[in-house]
């Protein structure tokens, strides 16, 4: 009987005692003190839960605001980019029986640097660099194609590579590289050189190792183009130079955007297209290093500043995806390559293009380039 009654009543206090209203015992008296403590405990628990709930709400609001801000910045950047319907025709090579090499996990984006011209007119690209995002090996790769390469341009015959850009813009340039080297290029980006100064300035400038002649070249171009009143803005005589591993005497100098652009375009001091391509790769590598350590606010500033100078064949959604891939790849190993290699070309005077770089062994050039882009 007692057992049944005990099972029917509630444990009002959560203390293991079962007391009903009709029962008075020593245990009901003992339970009076825990009742007050239990009530206080429940109040404290409610207050703690209320605080946690409010804290979580605040955190959620902060996250939503941050995400909204990020999306707003991304939206602004995407709206400021220029989009083109000039699409490369990959069939140009494939119709000639050429199989274009591609691989899952490897994205190839061709970057063209040009001076701004009137709408509908393409000048000759001063820089042609293939950016490869290799997620199979966690590597970010750069390949420079020298503009004086003497190649077959589909529909035009043999000419310098940068002539393809003048004849048919980025689409024909991509088709030319695919035709001659048998690699598939997924997308392309055109960057107006005017944006380069904004990129570098937004990042706070670049520290580069320069020779005496390179410093003098920057000063000379800056002065002759009336970008400074001083003939020796940097003044090569103010620095001490140390021998580096390449056998050159160099000094580290902080360059602003304008000065870094002259450095990247220099083909006079050290004197060849090979040297200029090397400088361009070094500048890009330094910019990537700066982007890697930049905070989100600076990255946003760079994106907003540069986007009006960018033209691409990608859709806004594709730009977002490629940008995310590139940002993720900033922490990967970076490698560089150049076409042609120094042991696989010769200089030749041509009737239509003047002095040009002719590849000695085309099959070797294709194999080595394919191995660099798609191999480990």
Roles of regions detected by a PLM:
Residues 104-107, 123-128, 137-145, 156-158, ...:
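Extracytoplasmic
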Residues 201-298, 375:
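Flexible, polar/acidic helix-loop-strand segments at domain edges
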Residues 94-98, 111-118, 124-129, 163-178, ...:
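N-terminal post-signal-peptidase region of extra-cytosolic proteins
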């Amino acid at each position: 009987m007692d057992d049944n009654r005990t099972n029917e009543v509630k444990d009002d206090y959560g203390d293991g005692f079962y007391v009903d209203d009709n029962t008075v015992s020593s245990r009901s008296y003992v339970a009076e003190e825990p009742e007050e403590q239990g009530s206080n405990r429940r109040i404290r628990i409610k207050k703690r839960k209320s605080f946690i709930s409010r804290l979580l709400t605040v955190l959620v609001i902060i996250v939503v605001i941050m995400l909204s801000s990020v999306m707003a910045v991304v939206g602004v950047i995407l709206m400021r980019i220029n989009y083109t319907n000039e699409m490369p025709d990959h069939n140009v090579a494939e119709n000639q029986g050429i199989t274009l090499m591609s691989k899952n996990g490897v994205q190839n984006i061709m970057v063209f640097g040009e001076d701004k011209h009137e709408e509908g007119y393409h000048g000759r690209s001063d820089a042609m660099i293939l950016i490869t995002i290799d997620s199979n090996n966690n590597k970010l790769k750069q390949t420079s194609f020298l503009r004086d390469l003497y190649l077959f341009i589909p529909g035009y015959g043999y000419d310098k590579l940068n002539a393809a850009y003048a004849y048919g813009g980025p689409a024909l340039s991509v088709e030319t590289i695919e035709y001659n080297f048998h690699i598939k290029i997924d997308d392309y980006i055109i960057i107006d050189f005017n944006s380069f100064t904004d990129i570098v300035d937004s990042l706070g400038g670049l520290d580069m190792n320069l020779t005496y002649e390179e410093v003098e070249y920057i000063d000379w171009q800056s002065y002759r183009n009336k970008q400074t009143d001083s003939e020796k803005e940097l003044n090569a005589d103010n620095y001490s130079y140390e021998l580096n591993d390449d056998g050159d005497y160099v000094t580290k100098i902080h360059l602003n955007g304008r000065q870094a652009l002259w450095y990247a375009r220099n083909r006079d001091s050290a004197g060849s297209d090979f040297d200029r391509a090397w400088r361009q790769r070094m500048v890009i590598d330094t910019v990537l290093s700066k982007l890697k350590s930049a905070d989100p606010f600076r990255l946003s500033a760079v994106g907003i500043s540069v986007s009006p100078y960018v033209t691409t064949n990608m859709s806004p959604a594709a730009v977002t995806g490629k940008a995310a891939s590139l940002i993720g790849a900033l922490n990967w190993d970076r490698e560089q390559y150049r076409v042609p290699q120094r042991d696989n070309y010769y200089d030749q005077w041509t009737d239509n293009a003047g002095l040009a770089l002719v590849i000695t062994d085309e099959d070797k050039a294709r194999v080595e380039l394919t191995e660099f882009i798609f191999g480990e």
